Amino acid sequence: MWQLLLPTALLLLVSAGMRTEDLPKAVVFLEPQWYSVLEKDSVTLKCQGAYSPEDNSTQWFHNENLISSQASSYFIDAATVNDSGEYRCQTNLSTLSDPVQLEVHIGWLLLQAPRWVFKEEDPIHLRCHSWKNTALHKVTYLQNGKDRKYFHHNSDFHIPKATLKDSGSYFCRGLVGSKNVSSETVNITITQGLAVSTISSFSPPGYQVSFCLVMVLLFAVDTGLYFSVKTNI
């Protein structure tokens, strides 16, 4: 039994080896969630991926250029325009992530959102962000040139359930001291049908299946060895 089991087990162990197509794709997250920021803002990019016990390093890429940082989080302390671009990450047991775009703007105000395309009934979260978080008051959010929401003190604007009527061009304005400032205009689109995916789910089925198969086969080999030795005794 043992003589037959060992070659079969070894063959299956080799076939259970990880292939590139079996590896999960790494995912990049932004903290805070805004992918449009102002100069001097701090941004943290986090890489979610699978690691082996021997190697927990992370490869980061900015505009396809390798970044020296090997930590799972990449921290930008004071963003500049040069930090704009595509960011990707990869671990030794994950393939290269999809790109995440970071946009660094110059100005007093920036209208921020986690994305610009939503589906009907999605919640929409808008933020009128000031440079270096300077105090801002008498803030107005405008849609298609018309006042949509007013706050005496700066506050985020929430739309609980989006409708097709919420599509359009948006910007915000307010007072910094006595200076009247406005953000650039952005376009928000509301779609019908399936939800717009913003964060890829992370699930490494290929790795888990292969690992479980290896463990089962190792158990089978040990069991076969035990009975073989017992029979010989």
UniProtKB/Swiss-Prot annotation:
Subcellular location: Cell membrane; Secreted
Stated role: Receptor for the Fc region of immunoglobulins gamma. Low affinity receptor. Binds complexed or aggregated IgG and also monomeric IgG. Contrary to III-A, is not capable to mediate antibody-dependent cytotoxicity and phagocytosis. May serve as a trap for immune complexes in the peripheral circulation which does not activate neutrophils.
Signal sequence interval, chain numbering: 1-16
Entry-linked Pfam families: Ig_2 (PF13895)
Annotated tissue distribution: Expressed specifically by polymorphonuclear leukocytes (neutrophils). Also expressed by stimulated eosinophils.
Tree of life domain: Eukaryota
Gene3D superfamilies associated with the record: Immunoglobulins
The entry's keywords: Cell membrane, Disulfide bond, Glycoprotein, GPI-anchor, IgG-binding protein, Immunoglobulin domain, Lipoprotein, Membrane, Receptor, Repeat, Secreted, Signal
Organism, scientific name: Homo sapiens (Human)
Lipidation (GPI-anchor amidated serine): 200
Outcome of substituting residue 36 to R: In allele FCGR3B*01
Gene Ontology cellular component list: external side of plasma membrane; extracellular exosome; extracellular region; plasma membrane; secretory granule membrane
Full protein name: Low affinity immunoglobulin gamma Fc region receptor III-B
Post-translational modification comment from the UniProt entry: Glycosylated. Glycosylation plays an inhibitory role in the interaction with IgG3.
Membrane topology listed for this record: Lipid-anchor; GPI-anchor
Main location (coarse class): membrane
Ig-like C2-type domain segment(s): 40-96, 121-179
